[in-house]
């Protein structure tokens, strides 16, 4: 079956691709639209509907004109060093507060250049902010080295482990990032954020619940997914225990997943795992930069209080966001924000092909 271009089936026909226990369902759709370049003559346009086999969430992969930027905006003014930034090295010690001694005797958690401090915003029972490098107010995507990203993740994991030690009820953990305003960042200085408490995030709970249901019927979904996708058109590469691939039905542009084998919770990640995640993320972000992209989100989630029994594996999801133009088109339309249906211009197979060479 064809995965990287519309399958030669009649419009509306459903194609199911079965390998092991996972069925990838897609449907070719056909629209009739006026072509202004042809004087308004009606023309047929193909698009593809796909359904995620685990969650049931669907995505629409468009054909024709792509939304990828042909050039990159000048970030000089946006990223210029301001008179004050709490994450800059000269202000960090006075503008941030140390953790209680029960969490860390040092007050702040440091790994390499990375520093983790308490979050002043109450997003969760326990929340922290990780700064990749207080000495650099702005770090562009292709400057996010494996060491910078890996050390920041390691520091955030150590905070997660400390939280779990002092508050065993905080069983739901995630580490996340907003980079530049289109991704939701309120500060330009690149940073990460975490959430740890007794209630999982909506998408986190959904993945765990569906992983549990899948395991009861078929075994581990995540193990089967990695085995099935290995060396296929959506495969990106393997670094340590982390398998990198693009999802069959993405939720955002340029989306890539990192699935960590045999690890069910964030607190179980080793320093080697964090280095592998950092290396993969660094290479993906460099690929985004080469595609004239400038903004991204990522999220790394654990599986909650029964992660191993539920068959969950730690997964990192990263995707690109709109560029920070003075007037820009948001990539979150009514399709995504209200109905949870992603509109995608580049297929997962195209995304994987563009990134794979860097692995």
Describe each model-derived feature in a short phrase.
Residues 151, 276-279:
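A generic alpha-helix signature
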Residues 2-189, 195-268, 272, 285-359:
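Active-site microenvironments that recognize anionic phosphate/pyrophosphate groups
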Residues 278-286:
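Internal helical hairpin/lid segments
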